[in-house]
């Protein structure tokens, strides 16, 4: 499929003889690994056999729908599924390196929140800090742009000028409504595109209380990295080496996917846990590492209390995992759970979470609280002085969580 899309990007839908051999020249692979020589070939007379001019091919404008991703079956996940690595960043770079005056492409929007295989921090920094985008139309739900096509994280098309530096005319398409503003894609230097203009307003109010909290002092510090207890196949999402009954040897509770075990847990020996043993005796919280669609009104899977002498499979993340900096009481854990279930918390997560997956980085815009007490939405709205319009906006998007 990627080859077909690449061919269409170069030639469009014209009914003409197509004289550049895309597959044999390995354009897709070379777009990521051999750009300098590839660009020389694309500009050469020999590549475009219909070009009778003796001069080098020049690109005034590059327009297209590049291939989005390529599955790499040689790289398996713990669930034995293939990784899908993003291709479109290489084609954006390729277009820019042709010295074209203007570039207009349609691509997934996952890069805006640094999500996905093949999306590097260096590349996102270059896109955001260059400020070369003149216009961008961004769809949170790809079906509003392409009927019956699901693209996690949404889709966008843009006008990019390599020698332009300035604000972007950014249009967000959401639930049939369009909002256009002139702005830099990262006006507060958070490292991501905050795609909701109301979110900028709310973040600014949180910043008035917490400072530049999103660059360090935020809920990310509470959440474990993926693969916290598991290693390889051991304690992976599909691992079934646990006992259904507790006994003298199998006395560590293992929380697993409920599709694997109806009760949601089994029992293992401490020696079955390959790493992170210091967290086992702690009070903690578990939350599914995947939850929601990225555009739904719940945002996250339901968190639950993790008692001492418990661990989890790859299905879950651990909140309060660090014995030195966390070490919460049971009461504090339940207060954290209440905070997670608040609409305010889940709205702040939704600013960055645009796919089903929720790695720890999606909690970047969630401020920390004093967890010696429970928090309600009313208290949180008051703490950050959210006005009635902002409160109603959050509650129009986020449903209550039981």
Which residues does each PLM region occupy?
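SAM-dependent methyltransferase catalytic region
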Residues: 1-136, 141-145, 158, 163-170
